[in-house]
């Protein structure tokens, strides 16, 4: 076993030394291949960013000074010229001169990384303290209203036992305000005209029973759309 092979396989070898050796092998291989199709003497004119990458994205060169299986990384991106990258890849893999010192076992083209514009996205509802405060107060108010509804429905008997009707068959008005509250109770009128909108005895809803209710009782009629929160 040659000294170069033993050095490359040594577990105590410094990573920088291994990287430099891989970089030298990479330059040797690319330069040799470049001379096959171009005489400009500068392979960097045809290969952009000629530098190794990490070993998990690499090709392997075998037979070089006995260093069988030495990993060499490539970052080859065609920049100019008429050469087809696939032809370059095939010629390296096959070898035009029959030499197997730089036989290519695996080829991974490393694409040129995209440089994205660095922008910090602004989180929603936090770009301005005023916006977040307004949204927070609206959410709190809504939650308080929902909690009141849940509390009313979780009482001992949220649905009145008279099925929406009074003791003498009169339409019951007490259950009509179960799911909403008057914002100005002192300004509310005692007139029952608004109640007749949804507690009329001749309404077709009076004959509809809720199948899941105990005893098949009729649920209370809901208020009009403009009178509060309802489901």
Curated annotation (Swiss-Prot):
Compositional bias (Acidic residues): 184-194
Record's compositionally biased regions (Pro residues): 220-231
**Region labeled Disordered — which residues?**
154-231
Q: Where is the composition biased (Low complexity)?
A: 195-207
Name of the protein in its database record: Uncharacterized ORF3 protein
